[in-house]
Amino acid sequence: PKRRTKGQIAIEAGLAPLADQLLDNPTLDPDITANDFINPEKGIEDRKAALDGAKFILMERFAEDAKLLAKLRGMLQRNGHIESKVITGKEKDGAKYQDYFEHSEALSHIPSHRALAMLRARNEGIISLTINPNPSLEDGNAECVRIIADHYKLDVLASPWLKQVAQWTWKIKLALPLENEFLAKIREVAEQGAIDVFAKNLNDLLMAAPAGAKTI
């Protein structure tokens, strides 16, 4: 049987209405609102347990929101950079990859050959690769959290707890899966690009005049 998520367990414990109330009314005080949901019989011993359950429900809901995911993917495609950093102690072994010991390049413009070289270096344990959502900002991840907050209309008056749920959602639920998704896409596009270049070169070779022959 499929393992139940923390959010599903919280829903079974009756905490979905708490999650809904806090999201629908962002200025509510979470601690006061959670008092009505304490239920030791269902394992909700105190306010913290109630709010933890509501947090898991909202995080899973946010992470499965197709419209939100489309906004985040669009932002990463426009502004994201792939960044590489040499793994300490691998400088000598990976000397041929030294161009990528500390490198940053826009996801939307990276050439196939460079993407493949960076992925190869990572697979050989020479460098680490990460996606920076927006390197023009001091904290690129903050842009993703802002998109989540804006999507659910969490403005300056929203409770700090709700804003933290947006942060947790990005950090725990979305950052790594989206990074892996983009790295896989880069590999797919780069490999196809390399195949296309190879095919074109091969075609040019086949269409060329035989060696030693003179075209008239």
Label for each model-derived stretch:
Residues 1-215:
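Duplex nucleic acid-engaging cores and interfaces of nucleic-acid transaction enzymes
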